C-alpha cells in the first residue's frame, strides 16, 4: 500500500515492465498474430491497455477527485475494437507506458483520504477509489495473463517439440 493509503500502486507501476519482459522477443508479425479471428493479438491488447489508461481510468480518476459522487457509465471494451485493429505494437506500448507513468505519479500525489472517495457506477452501484484501483489491478493482471498466453502459443510452443503436448494453452 502506498504512503497515502492507496492500494495496488506498486502492481500498477510494475505492469509496463512485466509486459515489456513478455514482449521483448516478439517480432511485429508475432505481435499481430491472433489465435482466432475473434481473439485479440498482443498488439490489440497493448492498444486496449493504452486506450483504457487514458479514456477510462484517468478520466475516472480525475472525476473521483474533482466531483462529489460522480456517476460512471459501464465501460464497453467491445465498442472500441475497431480502434485496436492494425495498431503498431511498439507505439501502443510506448503510449501505455507513458500514460501509466503519469497516472502513477498522479496517484502517489493524492491526499491520504483519497481512497475513500465515492462514485456511483451505473452497473455496480457505489464504489470507492480504492475499489477502482483494485479493479484496475485485476484488469492489468488479466491482460498480463492474456499476453503471456499469446507469447507462449506464438513464440515458444512450436520450439518445445513433443514436450509442448503437456501444456494446455488458452491464448
Positions of PLM-derived features:
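Non-transmembrane alpha-helical segments in soluble domains
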Residues: 9, 20-23, 43-46, 50, ...
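Solvent-exposed interaction patches of small proteins and small membrane subunits
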Residues: 3, 7-10, 34, 66, ...
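A short, mixed-charge helix-start or loop-turn motif at secondary-structure junctions
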Residues: 1-5, 82-89, 122-129
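Alpha-helical bundle segments that constitute or directly flank the non-heme di-iron/ferroxidase center
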Residues: 1-29, 52-63
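Short, contiguous alpha-helical
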Residues: 32-75, 118-171
Amino acid at each position: 500500500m502506498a504512503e497515502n493509503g492507496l492500494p495496488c500502486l506498486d502492481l500498477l507501476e510494475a505492469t509496463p515492465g512485466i509486459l515489456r519482459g513478455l514482449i521483448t522477443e516478439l517480432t511485429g508479425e508475432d505481435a499481430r498474430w491472433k489465435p482466432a479471428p475473434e481473439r485479440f493479438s498482443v498488439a490489440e491488447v497493448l492498444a486496449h491497455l493504452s486506450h483504457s489508461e487514458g479514456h477510462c481510468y484517468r478520466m475516472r480518476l480525475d472525476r473521483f477527485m474533482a466531483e462529489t459522487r460522480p456517476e460512471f457509465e459501464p465501460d464497453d471494451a467491445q465498442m472500441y475494437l475497431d480502434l485496436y485493429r492494425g495498431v503498431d505494437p511498439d507505439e501502443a506500448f510506448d503510449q501505455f507506458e507513458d500514460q501509466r507513468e503519469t497516472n502513477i505519479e498522479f496517484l502517489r500525489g493524492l491526499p491520504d483520504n483519497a481512497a475513500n472517495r465515492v462514485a456511483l457506477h451505473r452497473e455496480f452501484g457505489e464504489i470507492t477509489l480504492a475499489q477502482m484501483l483494485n479493479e484496475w489491478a485485476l484488469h492489468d493482471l488479466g491482460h498480463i495473463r492474456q499476453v503471456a498466453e499469446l507469447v507462449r502459443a506464438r513464440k515458444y510452443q512450436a520450439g518445445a517439440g513433443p514436450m509442448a503436448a503437456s501444456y494446455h494453452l488458452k491464448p
